[in-house]
From Swiss-Prot:
Its main location: membrane. Substrate binds at N79, R80, D122, S160, N164, K167, H195. Hydrolyzes the pyrophosphate bond of UDP-2,3-diacylglucosamine to yield 2,3-diacylglucosamine 1-phosphate (lipid X) and UMP by catalyzing the attack of water at the alpha-P atom. Involved in the biosynthesis of lipid A, a phosphorylated glycolipid that anchors the lipopolysaccharide to the outer membrane of the cell. Keywords: Cell inner membrane, Cell membrane, Hydrolase, Lipid A biosynthesis, Lipid biosynthesis, Lipid metabolism, Manganese, Membrane, Metal-binding. Its EC number is 3.6.1.54. GO terms for cellular component: cytoplasm; extrinsic component of plasma membrane. It catalyses: UDP-2-N,3-O-bis[(3R)-3-hydroxytetradecanoyl]-alpha-D-glucosamine + H2O = 2-N,3-O-bis[(3R)-3-hydroxytetradecanoyl]-alpha-D-glucosaminyl 1-phosphate + UMP + 2 H(+). This is UDP-2,3-diacylglucosamine hydrolase. Belongs to the LpxH family. GO terms for biological process: lipid A biosynthetic process.
Length: 240
């Protein structure tokens, strides 16, 4: 009896080892789970469900196979794949969740999210996020031809990489006060998120009690997952 969480795989054809590792994960570890939650940035980029990238179809088939085996899969959008829509969700069998969700996991209330909304010290990113999450902006973008969307996405990624190279590590991490505020708003003692690529279990205080923030790692040379059972919450790194 276990529920699994992963995030920040950043799947792309240029990283076949990570793709292969994810396929093995779906076929082995995930098959034993009660449910799988993907907390954003499953893909390196997403320019629309109509993108004919063969990798997208391959991943949809693999996730659907997991779901058809009896393991439900849930998805929270990340900052790289926030345009994943109902079509891909239907093809993959995933259930799309809001950006914040509280789960009852074996009697333990747990708040889950991608994590980028916690990085409130990065004012530039938060301003950009507000723009691209505007429904009108998204609708307009999705009406553009695919080749134009690809160019825009490539420019945005290049700009983001350049901007991040000049930012301090602290600015790109979560804001401690924002974390506590979110946990107290939802009245939880556990928070699981990704985004920062800094896997760790942090102890803090929220709601006047001990609390825990569990941060998933990105998939690079190894995979990262959080395994929640009735008795424990584990952050686990594993070879790909």
């Amino acid at each position: 009896m276990a529920t699994l969480f992963i995030a920040d795989l950043h799947l792309q054809t240029e990283e076949p080892a990570i793709v292969a590792g994810f396929l093995r994960f779906l076929a082995v570890e995930a098959r034993q789970a009660d449910a799988l939650y993907i907390l954003g940035d499953l893909f390196e980029a997403w320019i629309g469900d109509d993108d004919p990238n063969p990798l997208h179809r391959e991943m949809a088939v693999a996730i659907k196979s997991l779901v058809d085996s009896g393991v439900p899969c849930f998805f929270i959008h990340g900052n790289r794949d926030f345009l994943i829509g109902k079509r891909f969700a239907r093809e993959s069998g995933m259930t799309l969740l809001p950006q914040e969700k509280v789960l009852d996991l074996y009697g333990r209330n747990v708040l889950i999210m991608h994590g980028d909304t916690l990085c409130t010290d990065d004012a530039g990113y938060q301003a950009f996020r507000a723009k691209v999450h505007n429904p009108w902006v998204q609708r307009l973008f999705l009406t553009l031809p695919l080749f134009i969307r690809r160019r825009i996405a490539a420019r945005l990624r290049a700009g983001s990489k350049a901007a991040n190279s000049s930012k301090s590590l602290d600015i790109m991490d979560v804001n401690a006060q924002t974390v506590v505020a979110e946990m107290e708003k939802h009245r939880v003692q556990w928070l699981i998120h990704g985004h920062t690529h800094r896997p760790a279990v942090h102890e803090l205080s929220a709601n006047g009690q001990p609390a825990f923030r569990v941060v998933l790692g990105a998939w690079h040379h190894e995979g990262s997952m959080v395994k929640v059972t009735p008795d424990n919450v584990e952050l686990i790194a594993f070879p790909l």
